[in-house]
């Protein structure tokens, strides 16, 4: 080799050596270059950060601090003691313990301006159902410094259901009201505050109905209702009447809210109701603040002091203390969209969000369509129909195969169900999209997929916007569409600057890396390995979208997953939520899914297989997440215990009861509609001293109608129901009729102390609630006789007692630890009598 050749070789080697990137550049390229290892790192970090932030945001222990000021410490200590005393025993309206709670509260407030409300009301509480109620609400008024401001109502109910100690529902609400009362006693509020410690919310919102008839109601403009439909945890802003009042919740120290639950009420996904409904229908503006999980302990003996903490109580109470200090309320009365994240509260009128949605829905198609036309026509982006088949095909298959086999498992293991379903969905997308990519390679299939996902979000956003004010919980769709469509638009803009093959590469190259091994460089496309636009696209789309979907979806699932026990319709709804949740979790990563490395695919496969196997082997209920059964004992011609629950579980539980085995009682199980069943048996543990005597009074005929009356004697009783044949009874009275039928006005009327209700369409049921334990019920009615009878009519009377009864004590004591018990009716035992009039 000549000296010149040696010199040239040395120069080339020196040039190659000096052109090698330094360690920093190599590190950046290894992390942000479009490599499987880089994508794996990004995915793992996204999962960890998303789950971590969501856990922190929803954690009571990490986000709520106990009070530090001396006054607030004393208030919390006193209110916690109040809660312990209130929830010592179940205290339903039909129990003596209810009177004890009433007297306990009255003793606390006796030095303040209060009224032991004695309203008697009568109204139509349902179709063909009329209710008569005697109230003993406790009302307290604290006058504000500015008498021109409308008063604020604070409301909570002090009754429980007969099967529960009523700690969360609604002892914590009552204890919070007492805490606020002690606070305003030391700090005069600007506006007058009226406290309604109301009774008998559980069986018809009667305490709230009674307050609406009270003279103090006329002072009230706003309200805050405190409730509980779970057992501890954080108190969430369930719903608000309008934006003007909702935005004041941003002033509390620990805001925790989502309008997703508000939409659940509006769309009748959540079936239970609170006093909020009564106050809103009466024209007030306000909020519903409530504990919301877990529902399998709701209305059971597990709603006790052991399952809550002072920190839960303080979360509700401190927010109530802050809310009562609100200033002037905005006049805006349109529905509100609201949420919180990491303690920051966001609220906007639904119309403002609708305007944003309309702009996005129009803007992105208008901008992206011309860009796509230019790219395809002038930039030689070759697209075929098969390029667009992957996402819809995978989405359809994922919906078809995504449901886990054990339908009840979501009640106790929601995370396992979601993880299994999501893993299956990811694997379906992975297989289908790689198949499409193999059949018909695109120069930028990733961007094609982004556009397809953007279109999916666009369609959903059209539906959300068109649906209007009832869909206040779907604000996340706006965020998802914005980040996805914006990133797709950036990709299209990048393509417009791409030179036709042979030119220079653009800054946002549309090229996509092809490689064999993870560290193998593509020698045919040396510039592609330094393509970093994918990392920008990933960071714009995936972290934000994943957090929005995961946090919202998990909040919804934790709030409703226990309702899978309530009916087949609820089961279908829950699994629809799971499938949609999983789909939306996966959609943000779909554009990158073909580049998942073998370790991610293997891990997802393991999760899917293990999840499916466990769903077939694991019992769906356990002590921490029990199954709820409902109990009622009916005493009459056939003394029977009735237990209601989902099909396939009730008989096994009851067959092991001592009274069933010892008496060889026959279990009679009957399938009910919607996936439920009822099992009946003769207990032999009939409660004593429960008597109901029904006597008839002479009847008279007037204008084709027959008037009759009965007297119901039920000692130590507060609750009875009179059942009439459908559509025959046209008027009822608690007392005695003073006028003939034609003289009675339609609806409710009162005459000489008698409470009358007339409905020409027919009254099938009269509910009676009284305060005097031993006073007889006097009920009159007028009915239209059938042509083929002789004017007679059979009436059924059922009276309920809420105190513990032997048969109920037995099922609680001897049932498995994965079962909890709740009442089926207004009491645990009902005595039934029939009478012909």
Curated annotation (Swiss-Prot):
Compartments, record wording: Vacuole membrane
Annotated SUPFAM superfamilies: Zn-dependent exopeptidases
Record: residues binding Zn(2+) 2: 169, 202, 299
Family matches, as Gene3D superfamilies: Zn peptidases
Transmembrane domains' residue ranges: 37-57, 356-376, 385-405, 416-436, 447-467, 475-495, 540-560, 573-593, 599-619
Residues with glycosylation annotation: 143, 561, 689
Keyword terms, alphabetized: Glycoprotein, Hydrolase, Membrane, Metal-binding, Metalloprotease, Protease, Transmembrane, Transmembrane helix, Vacuole, Zinc
Active site: 201 (proton acceptor)
Topology Vacuolar: residue spans: 58-355, 406-415, 468-474, 561-572, 620-837
EC number(s) stated in the UniProt entry for this protein: 3.4.-.-
Top enzyme class: hydrolase
Membrane topology, from the record: Multi-pass membrane protein
Similarity comment text for this entry: Belongs to the peptidase M28 family.
Protein name stated in the entry: Vacuolar membrane protease
